[in-house]
Amino acid sequence: MRYFSGLTLALALLFFPPCTLHAQDLSPRAYLITPIHSNAVTLSYSFSDGNINFNGALPVSDAKGRYSVPIFAYYHSFNFFGRSANAAAALPYGVGNFHGTAADVPQHLYRSGLVDSFYRVSVNLRGGPAMPAREFVKWHQKVLLGVGLNVIAPTGQYDPTKLINWGANRWAFKPEFGYSQRWGNWILDGYAGGWFFTTNHEFWSHTSSYPGTRSQSQKPMASFEGHISYDFKPGVWISLDGNFWIGGRTSVAGIENPLTKQQNSRLGGTGAIRIAKHQSLKFSYSDGTYIRYGGNYQSVSVGWQYSWLGKPN
């Protein structure tokens, strides 16, 4: 039982902090602007499968995970003191199986439920004034600079008596700086930010072996992301994507485990194509290139988007 508890604890630390499903995300063209009053809804599905690297933190072998995450998302652009700005929200649902061998005993876990919701707001600082559609069609991008704030709210499924939960029972915040520059049909994007976490005050608590409560905390984690993309024609483009994040050591009941420090990177590609006036499809693939601690997954996703232009007030 001691090693099985260690396995489930490690899985909880690896997969279900708020940063986990989002720190590995690759999001090309996140700081491109759209006309004010633009709206979009997106339905997407992602599938991830791969190994789990414990970096010697636990005597666990053959640890693997496979999960699916359908997501509903909404996007809206607006005028913020003369600058282009936008806000987005995403509601994911997770279904996954996780297994490994601890003390020569195979173990298997299954979870299904709501994942913590994700929110983002960004504001252009240079190169992208707020514009209605009639002005936007005459505008040509050069250099864009912006700032953003990503927030993960504790709205996912969480049971403090279980170690594996889709929700993390805490908030996460990521302030970010974004850069985008166009050369003809090419666009270069770069983002830099950091994740900050509140404390989960009911981590694996109220159990028969531990009737009280204990806390889980996590150190900040730096995040860097870059993309280079090419436009074939309006609404049709591809990109090469990469990211790197470092930090995020975790502590349980005030005891820090230095082996849980993350120092990971992913590489992938994205493609988008417009299929109708208001509809488009997006496909993406990514894989871990260096995973010091955490899930080393291959991930594929497909999304359908419907967009429209709202009427000014």
Model segments located where?
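Outer-membrane beta-barrel biogenesis signature
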Residues: 21-42, 61, 127-142, 309-313
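Residues that define the transmembrane beta-barrel architecture of outer-membrane proteins
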Residues: 37, 64-70, 112-119, 143, ...
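Residues on the lipid-exposed face of transmembrane beta-strands in outer-membrane beta-barrel proteins
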Residues: 43-45, 72-76, 119-125, 149, ...
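Surface-exposed strand-loop-strand hairpins of Gram-negative outer-membrane beta-barrel proteins
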Residues: 48-69, 106-107, 160-167
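Outer membrane beta-barrel transmembrane domains
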Residues: 202, 209-313
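Outer-membrane beta-barrel channels and translocator barrels
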Residues: 36, 48, 79-82, 126-128, ...
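Transmembrane beta-barrel strands of outer-membrane/channel proteins
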Residues: 41-47, 87-95, 145-153, 190-196, ...
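Outer-membrane pore/translocation modules
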Residues: 94-217, 259
